[in-house]
Regions:
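Local pocket/hinge segments that shape ligand/substrate recognition
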Residues: 26, 165-232
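Solvent-exposed coil/turn segments that connect beta secondary-structure elements
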Residues: 13, 18, 59-60, 67-71, ...
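Solvent-exposed, polar/charged alpha-helical surfaces in well-ordered, non-transmembrane soluble domains
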Residues: 11-19, 71, 75, 139, ...
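Gly/Pro-rich hinge or "lid" segments in bacterial periplasmic/extracellular proteins
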Residues: 49, 66-136, 140
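Ligand-site clamp/hinge motif
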Residues: 99, 104, 126-174, 204, ...
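Surface-exposed binding/hinge segments that line
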Residues: 7-14, 27-88
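Short helix-loop capping/hinge motifs at secondary-structure junctions, enriched
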Residues: 2-3, 130-133, 197-205
């Protein structure tokens, strides 16, 4: 159920995905949908978004047509780019959609409140219409964007904030602090090569550049947040 009381339907996903690949929307993650039928042609402006290979079979079921086997496709669906959007709400808000808490419609465990679009604070308020609202233990989360890591650490130590993410040199300084919790997650970072460069068109040269990167030194001395290098 949307936070305005309307039901979430399969059409909300179809609309959202068509909007994702619509070149007029300029979505930065549109490429993630490239294995869906006609997605590349739509992103190139050669076909209408309505021709995307996604259709609503019923109010609760969608049919997705892929152009090739995509083993990771199901994991993509958990990414925010594939979240549903309420067509009537998006159309009503127009260019203002997503620019403030009043212009955002939610269907998750929280709604966003008190955000003006540029401010560095907002509130996440429990969504009573969420299907599993009884399992949501927090009534409200107050979010602050604090750009200086040392500042947020000081606020945490003073008890003014409940959570602080630390990076770089502070990780080493706080390594023995009993309040520090290390959460290791699989994450991939990459370097993009400009294939317009005649030399970088050579796959062996690109592979060679990758081989000379000292990953251990990179994570220890540059990132410095406790990350562990992997091969590849």
């Amino acid at each position: 159920v949307w936070s305005n009381g309307e039901p979430v339907t399969a059409n909300d996903f179809v609309f959202a995905w068509q909007r994702l690949v619509d070149p007029e929307a300029g979505a930065s993650y549109a490429y993630l949908a490239e294995t869906i039928k006609n997605a590349n042609e739509i992103m190139a402006g050669e076909m209408d978004p309505a021709e995307l290979g996604v259709t609503a079979v019923s109010d609760t079921e969608i049919k997705i047509e892929l152009t090739q086997p995509t083993p990771y496709f199901e994991s993509l669906l958990a990414f925010s780019a594939f979240f549903p959007q309420n067509e009537a709400f998006v159309t009503e808000k127009g260019d203002k959609y997503g620019t403030s808490s009043e212009n955002i419609l939610a269907n998750g465990p929280f709604t966003i409140e008190n955000w003006d679009g540029t401010g560095l604070t907002w509130d996440l308020v429990k969504n009573e219409d969420y299907y599993a609202a009884d399992e949501v233990q927090l009534e409200e989360v107050n979010v602050q964007v604090i750009k200086e890591t040392s500042t947020v650490v000081n606020l945490f130590q003073q008890g003014s904030v409940d959570n602080a993410q630390v990076t770089g040199e502070l990780v080493k300084q706080l390594a023995t602090d009993p309040n520090v919790v290390v959460q290791k997650k699989a994450r991939t970072a990459y370097i993009e090569f400009n294939h317009d460069n005649v030399y970088l068109q050579n796959a062996k040269l690109r592979a060679a550049i990758g081989l000379v990167i000292n990953r251990d030194e990179l994570v220890d001395s540059v990132i410095g947040d406790g990350s562990t290098a992997i091969g590849g």
